[in-house]
């Protein structure tokens, strides 16, 4: 059954996550999980490469959304700034739950952020990778 989107933001987020998965697979990551959810948080993508786990947060923004950002602030527009301290704390708890539930608490891991800039009309995307975010 296809996913039903309740908002344009959710649709953009889902497309961005799909683009992120393709990007990771192209760069030799194995995708282990998507949208791992607990009541206290969510992990967008869990991937593995070279025997290391990667917990990936995806932030997506469409060109249509960017058109509402003024020219003066566009150069400084950083969706990664939406990684608020409370979000990081919730993510840390969710990661610990994931590791324990999968018996992976001894495995090396890191948190990365993929910022996906979408041009939905042109069907293009640019990806910015922010590696090893400190929780």
Segments predicted by a language model, with ranges:
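Conserved catalytic cores of phosphodiester-cleaving nucleases, focusing on short active-site segments
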Residues: 24, 43-68, 91
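Short, low-complexity, polybasic intrinsically disordered segments
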Residues: 117-135
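Acidic-basic catalytic patches of nuclease active cores, encompassing PD-(D/E)XK
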Residues: 1-34
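Catalytic cores of nucleic-acid endonucleases
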Residues: 60-117
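Short acidic/glycine-enriched loop/turn segments that link adjacent beta-strands
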Residues: 38-41
